Amino acid sequence: MPEPIQIAEEKMKKAIETLKEEFATVRAGRANPHILDKVMVDYYGVPTPIPQLASITVPEARMIVIQPWEARMLKEIEKAIQKADLGVNPANDGKVIRLIFPELTEERRKELVKQVKKMAEDAKVAIRNIRREAIDEYKKMKKNNEITEDDLKDAEEDVQKLHDKYIEQIEKLLSAKEKEIMEV
């Protein structure tokens, strides 16, 4: 059976991956094709992400071009983008859909920073909860005489070090994302 610290590390890695995915959906000053990863289109009755239905290119810093592999999907993709409320209106020319991203206002940038700070805080809370679960698991093992008091202290220290490492990663990711958003 895996150690509680191994389980905790796996969960912490997942929390970081989730945060990275969330950050990717937050639009900074330039067009990011990942903004479309979670936009679902009805494809023969199955909700399908846009990247699986079309080629996506970024010909300019503030433009994304979506070229569906099936022409009939053009309207469906356009509808899905409008419904997703990405803060951009799709322009459909009959062959491709162009998304032109407006310059971000100072106010919008500050809103986005607030949004990513909340995402980072949620990730930190998740990391803290994982730390607590792991320590509780070790305490249970101590109570059942599976480990000694010294083992418990060592385990608590190791879990704390792991916690600190992942909290630091969150701080670095947040700092980089804030910088990206505030870049004009």
From Swiss-Prot:
Its Gene Ontology molecular function terms?
A: ribosomal large subunit binding
Entry keyword set = Cytoplasm, Protein biosynthesis
Q: Which domain of life is it from?
A: Bacteria
Cellular location(s) = Cytoplasm
Q: Spell out the GO cellular component terms annotated for this protein, sorted alphabetically and separated by semicolons.
A: cytoplasm
User: Which NCBIfam families does the UniProt record give?
Assistant: frr
Q: Which family does it belong to?
A: Belongs to the RRF family.
What is the documented function of this protein? Responsible for the release of ribosomes from messenger RNA at the termination of protein biosynthesis. May increase the efficiency of translation by recycling ribosomes from one round of translation to another.
Q: What is this protein called?
A: Ribosome-recycling factor
- The gene behind this protein is frr
